[in-house]
């Protein structure tokens, strides 16, 4: 939209929190967590998560405040900051990186699911990629209402899946998680924090696209900061 989001179209804090969680619960971030778990000991793992999550949370919370206060999308805010022609570069960069993560996301969903349900049928992977892509594109096409519905369905499911996976890892592993974290593989805490930030800083820059639908700046800031920190 080329206009600020009107007051009657704003969403309450619970809905915004679910939308932001749905935005940040992403397979690439889960992959980053896996790499940190391999490369760091338990202390370094926690420090990298806290440092990277805090920086990412503060950065996106500031963008959320501006987005909610103005009701404008990231691209329109870029026009105010850099002018119409100057805004082409940041808009193009964000669009390019988001298209790339879109492809990564659907592939990280389709490949393991295909291996689980039909390991001997290679055509299942492109089919699942197409279906996932249609669903993701459809939610964006139909706007905030569709994203709200998807978030209310997907966030609890992803949370339950994550908890179940952790429980299974503890029960089936040949050593406790603490023992597996006992030794670092040489990855530094700062590098780990950089991985946390880098895994979602591009998507986080587009935070105003979502936060502009919050009723108050306080709701936008808190829901965004908590979602990105988690």
PLM regions with names:
Residues 35-64, 86-88, 228-229:
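Extracellular loop-to-transmembrane helix junctions
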Residues 140, 156-182, 192, 197-200:
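Hydrophobic alpha-helical segments and their helix-loop junctions in multi-pass secondary transporters
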Residues 49-82, 91-97:
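Juxtamembrane transmembrane-helix boundary signature
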Residues 34-39, 64-65, 89, 108-119, ...:
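Membrane-water interface regions at transmembrane-helix termini and the short interhelical loops
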Residues 5, 9-13, 142-152, 202-230:
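Hydrophobic, small-residue-rich membrane helices and short re-entrant helix-turn-helix hairpins
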Residues 28, 54-59, 94-103, 157-168, ...:
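Selective recognition of specific alpha-helical transmembrane segments in multi-pass small-molecule
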Residues 1-43, 187-193, 212-222:
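Membrane-interface "cap" regions at the ends of multi-pass membrane proteins
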Residues 29-33, 71, 175, 197-220:
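Juxtamembrane interface elements at the cytosolic ends of transmembrane helices
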């Amino acid at each position: 939209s080329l206009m600020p989001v009107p007051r009657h179209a704003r969403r309450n804090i619970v809905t915004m929190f679910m939308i932001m969680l749905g935005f940040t619960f992403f397979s690439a971030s889960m992959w980053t967590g896996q790499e940190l778990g391999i490369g760091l000991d338990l202390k370094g793992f926690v420090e990298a998560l806290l440092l990277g999550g805090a920086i990412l949370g503060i950065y996106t919370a500031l963008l959320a405040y501006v987005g909610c206060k103005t009701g404008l999308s990231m691209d329109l805010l870029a026009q105010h900051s850099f002018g119409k022609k100057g805004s082409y570069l940041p808009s193009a960069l964000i669009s390019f990186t988001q298209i790339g993560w879109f492809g990564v996301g659907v592939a990280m969903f389709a490949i393991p699911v295909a291996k689980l349900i039909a390991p001997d049928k290679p055509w299942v992977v492109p089919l699942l990629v197409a279906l996932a892509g249609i669903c993701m594109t459809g939610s964006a096409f139909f706007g905030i209402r569709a994203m709200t519905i998807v978030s209310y369905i997907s966030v609890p499911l992803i949370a339950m899946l994550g908890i179940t996976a952790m429980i299974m890892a503890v029960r089936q592993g040949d050593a406790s998680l603490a023992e597996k974290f006992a030794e670092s593989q040489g990855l530094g805490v700062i590098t780990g924090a950089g991985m946390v930030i880098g895994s979602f800083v591009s998507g986080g820059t587009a935070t105003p696209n979502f936060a502009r639908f919050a009723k108050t700046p306080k709701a936008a800031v808190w829901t965004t900061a908590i979602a990105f920190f988690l």
